[in-house]
Amino acid sequence: MSALHQLSALNFLVIGLGAAFGAWTRWLLGLSLNPLFVALPLGTLAANVIGGYLVGVAVGIFHINTHFSLAWKLFAITGFLGGLTTFSTFSAEVVERLLAGQPAWAIGLASVHLAGSLTATYLGLLTVGATRIWA
């Protein structure tokens, strides 16, 4: 399917709905978790690690079960998980630590996000048995 054929009203709608639900989820995670440990914004970390896990699950499921429509893939991955995970907030929080003269915290924060998200994505693929596809 060409990119032009994917530009349908339904696809715009499902991406937008998914993104709204993902962003609301991220906002609620921030509200509930960020106050727990101010030095490490746990809401952003949770959003990125949970999103990493769920994208692994989704990619695995969609790869194994080819009967899912493009709309479901766009809703789940591009919409919901795109709205849930947040590279811009993560970047701002790391730079905030650097500007506060806390380079060790900045490096640690970046490392935890990267390692956590990549590990969670792999675990998501393992959950649905999708790693054997690429072996």
Swiss-Prot record:
Keywords tagged on the record: Cell inner membrane, Cell membrane, Ion channel, Ion transport, Membrane, Metal-binding, Sodium, Transmembrane, Transmembrane helix, Transport
GO BP term, example: cellular detoxification of fluoride
Subcellular localization(s) per the UniProt record: Cell inner membrane
Any GO MF annotation of the entry: metal ion binding
Catalysed reaction, written as an equation: fluoride(in) = fluoride(out)
Membrane topology: Multi-pass membrane protein
Activity regulation, short description: Na(+) is not transported, but it plays an essential structural role and its presence is essential for fluoride channel function.
Keyword Metal-binding appears in the UniProt entry: yes
Keyword Ion transport applies: yes
Taxonomy, superkingdom: Bacteria
InterPro entries named among the record's database cross-references: FluC
Chain residues that bind Na(+): 82, 85
GO cellular component labels: plasma membrane
Record field: transmembrane: 12-32, 42-62, 70-90, 106-126
Pfam families: CRCB
Family named by the database record: Belongs to the fluoride channel Fluc/FEX (TC 1.A.43) family.
Role: Fluoride-specific ion channel. Important for reducing fluoride concentration in the cell, thus reducing its toxicity.
Protein name: Fluoride-specific ion channel FluC
Species the sequence originates in: Dechloromonas aromatica (strain RCB)
